Amino acid sequence: MVRVCRVVPKDWSKFQPVGNVIPRTRFIVFKTPINSQLSTKIHKEQRFTTNDLFRQLSERGQYLGLVVDLSDTDRYYDKKDITGMCVQYEKVNCPGRGFIERDDCVESFHQVIQDYTDKCDDPDALIGVHCTNGINRCGYLICRFLIDRLGWSSHEAIDAFEQARGYSIEKGAYVMALHKAAKDKRDKQVDSDSDSSERQRKKKNKRKHREIVEHENIVLINTIIGELGSQAASVSGTDYQNSPNGVSVDPGQPQPHHWGFAIKRSKYAQLNQPVANGANTPPEPSEGTPQEEEEFEEDFEEIEEETETEPGKGQSVSSKRRARRNRMQKYMQVMQRGRFHEIQAIREEVALSHGSARD
């Protein structure tokens, strides 16, 4: 059984029951309807029930989509009188004392309005809000929504509410709290703008630093490629038609062999020279140190690898030079494209080839 109030709220009768729609919003404010039992205690012309509410709105060509009850009791009328008319009903209990200190009431009201506007596709369906008299608590919460969610100033919100309702907010503490809420929002927005400027500055510095690092990497890679080109030119001799280091070679002129090849060939000739005492007489031991003899043997083995090429096994010197030339051309093409990941892969390939050669 629904509990009912036995006393008409104080000063309830002196306020007009329904105000006008707040401009640029869907809010309409009214005082709380009362049940038929309470209506018998006042004059007929002062009565205001849920039936009177819907009748007055219908005469204006208006209709409700949501009713938000801000009173701290449910004894004035039965909410089924609202939901029975296919109108959504929401309750946000707001006490008469200490109300402006209750941030949870503000957040609950904001959430109820936001949820309804997000789901409702009918822009003409009004949002009815009432407390006991439809003045103080209604005025504070509606103005807070206009300030916090719609970006209105406190003066704009208060003026719009008071003109639509026909009455001023009576409690000065509520008005001061609205001005303070608007000031806090402005200060917060200034701090947010300064934080945004700081983020933009850091982003710009980060982008500038990245460009500097990329430029340094390109210079370093160009230097490495230049050194590799110089080394390849010194090793390959005149077989390069277009040297990476810019040295032009005339293919018509005979070019001398590399100095290392000349030394190895002379040592190989000395090793194969017949001995004066006879073919079977072993050569006289060299007067060099054991380290020099070991180096001589290694050079001899290298000359054998360069001068003797068995069919189907290994590569000739000219084949190696051609392969080396192709690799250098590939390196230059990669550098011209300027793609960092390809350049990095070339660097790793060169490092691995040098490491394997040493091993």
Curated annotation (Swiss-Prot):
Residues 234-246 have a biased composition (Polar residues). Keywords: Hydrolase, Protein phosphatase. This is Probable tyrosine-protein phosphatase pir-2. Residues 200-210, 319-328 have a biased composition (Basic residues). Disulfide bonds: none annotated. Its EC number is 3.1.3.48. PANTHER family: MRNA-CAPPING ENZYME (PTHR10367), TYROSINE-PROTEIN PHOSPHATASE F54C8.4-RELATED (PTHR10367:SF27). Belongs to the protein-tyrosine phosphatase family. Non-receptor class CDC14 subfamily. The keyword Hydrolase applies. Residues 184-199 have a biased composition (Basic and acidic residues). CDD domains: DSP_DUSP11. Pfam families: DSPc. It comes from Caenorhabditis elegans. Residues 290-309 have a biased composition (Acidic residues).
